[in-house]
Design a protein with these regions (language model features):
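Generic alpha-helical hydrophobic packing signal
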Residues: 79-81, 167, 244
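Residue-level signal for pocket-adjacent positions within structured domains
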Residues: 28-31, 87, 103, 107, ...
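Short, glycine/acidic-enriched loop or turn micro-motifs at the edges of active sites
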Residues: 13, 66, 89, 139, ...
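Generic, ordered loop/turn and secondary-structure boundary motif
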Residues: 17-18, 34, 65, 93, ...
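His/Asp/Glu-enriched, well-ordered alpha-helical/loop segment
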Residues: 29-58, 105, 124-133, 138-211
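C-terminal cap of metal-dependent C-N hydrolases
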Residues: 148-151, 205-255
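Histidine/acidic residue-rich metal-binding segments in metalloenzymes
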Residues: 1-133
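Glycine/Thr-rich phosphate-binding loops of Rossmann-like dinucleotide-binding domains
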Residues: 17, 70, 93, 141-143, ...
């Protein structure tokens, strides 16, 4: 708090993790994997929310995955703590069942959890408990992800699919408006990290994404910007086709 700097925290206590990347639940039991319990996240979130409350520090709970952790953050905010929280598109779109379908491309830290957790994350987004949507972009090679589940690295790529999944999972079902999604993905993260949020005004630097909200596109491995293709969303048809990405006035992506 004395330094007036934001603190971002990945919340997992290894003491409550048998094996990372998969939720400790029905899928881990089926695979005899062990898994990472929601308790591993919940105890760390509770600790850091209490510390934020007592110190006045500005804290961000990164890529929240547990419904109980959402409730802990909600309570901390009501008590006056300067606590913020992120959610990723994969955590509000998929559940632990994705591991059975997508294998290592659904292994991540913190892991995908239950449908109840997914719904609680969406509720947290709707009521403002979760105020940022981020990618937790973690590219890995095909060779790395081809390893057995227990030996493969955790994480998926998220840059190309984040906007589309936000539209599909949050806007189209009516949970939030498109403008609210833009705020969660751009304005709020910029403000938390003491950056100047972009604005569409005369003379301002053009930092823009031009897209068709309802235009469909198919996620294809060959369209990813890097060599990594570790995504469970390959083959999905999604809304929000992007035509241009403009950074500091320069076109850096064009379909």
């Amino acid at each position: 708090a004395e330094l007036d700097l934001p603190i971002s925290l990945h919340e997992e206590d290894p003491e409550f993790i048998i094996r990372p990347g998969v939720n400790q639940g029905k899928v881990a039991e089926q695979l005899e994997y062990g898994g990472a319990s929601a308790t591993a996240e919940d105890v760390m979130v509770a600790r850091d929310c209490i510390l934020a409350l007592h110190t006045g520090a500005s804290v961000c709970i990164q890529h929240i995955s547990s419904g109980n952790s959402v409730e802990i953050v909600r309570t901390a905010k009501k008590l006056g703590a300067d606590v913020h929280a992120e959610a990723t598109p994969h955590h509000f779109t998929l559940t632990e069942d994705a591991v059975l379908k997508y294998g290592t491309n659904a292994r991540m830290n913190p892991p995908l959890r239950t449908e109840e957790d997914r719904i609680k994350i969406i509720e947290g987004i709707k009521d403002g408990t979760i105020d940022m949507i981020v990618t937790d972009h973690a590219p890995h090679s095909d060779e790395e992800k081809a390893r057995p589940l227990e030996n493969a690295p955790s994480g998926i790529r998220g840059l190309e699919t984040s906007l589309a999944l936000g539209i599909k999972s949050l806007v189209e079902p009516g949970h939030i408006s498109l403008m609210k999604l833009m705020e969660l993905m751009s304005k709020n993260p910029a403000e938390f990290y003491r950056m100047i949020p972009g604005s569409i005004t005369k003379g301002a630097a053009a930092d823009l994404v031009i897209f068709g909200e309802k235009e469909l596109w198919t996620v294809r491995k060959e369209d990813f910007a890097s060599k990594a293709s570790n995504s469970p969303f390959i083959g999905w048809e999604l809304p929000g086709k992007i035509y241009y990405t403009i950074s500091s006035g320069k076109i850096v992506y064009q379909r």
